Amino acid sequence: MKIHHLNCGCMCPLGGAFYDGFSKGLHAHLVCHCLLIETERDGLVLVDTGFGQGDVREPSRLSGFFRVLNNIQRRESLTARARVEALGFSVADVRHIILTHLDFDHAGGLTDFPHARIHLMQQEIDTAQQRHSWLQRERYRPGQWSATSGWEGYQVQGERWFGFDAVTALNGLPPEILLVPLAGHTPGHAGIAIQQPQGWLLHGGDAWFYRDEMRQPQRHCT
């Protein structure tokens, strides 16, 4: 399987290195890191979707609070759809989307791929639909995903894998792609593991924000 690393959105909040760990100026620079996986028989698989075309054209889909706080850079050229098409593929080639979680900067592109099956933890679906707290109402934006279909929710169950519990394969996808529950950043947050010839790649979503968080003697993850 070939994996493309895509930046599908940009946010530049005030705070510099205090926010992202490395920026030199007043503003931090955060990317929406997505993966595009080319499979042999199951088409393209997109891991997270960043911001979508709807977010660029209709800013009201996003929380006004987070638009200001995160200084979201709305650029159509950075959407997952634009990135996929720039690689020579079509929207229809994306047959599966796997979400680490449903935050606005990860789920915004769902409506740009209307025929894709959507895989994520069932707990995340339930939490996003209920939106009990103010923060949940700001971070989970139904306008980004309420019109989509083909959702597949997964329970916390499965096999032990490299010290992680309840890791599971995904329906309709090769066994080299696994869903890894990583609750914390959100109740139904998950990582996506992809087996490659040289080893495993784990997309951790927002379980950590900066690579040095995983290099310190005492690791700090969200």
What residue spans do the PLM features occupy?
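Active-site metal-binding loops of divalent metal-dependent hydrolases
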Residues: 9, 49-52, 102, 124, ...
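A hydrophobic, small-residue-rich beta->alpha segment in the mid-to-C-terminal subdomain
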Residues: 204-222
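Metallo-beta-lactamase
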Residues: 72-89, 93, 122-181
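Short hydrophobic/aromatic-enriched beta-strand-loop microsegments
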Residues: 117-122, 203-205
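Core dinuclear metal-dependent hydrolase active-site scaffold
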Residues: 5, 22, 34-39, 156-196
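Active-site metal-binding motif and surrounding structural segment of the metallo-beta-lactamase
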Residues: 60-120
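Conserved beta-strand hairpin/beta-sheet module of binuclear metal-dependent hydrolase folds
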Residues: 2, 10-82, 192-205
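Active-site environment of divalent metal-dependent phosphoester hydrolases
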Residues: 14, 102-107, 186-189, 209-212
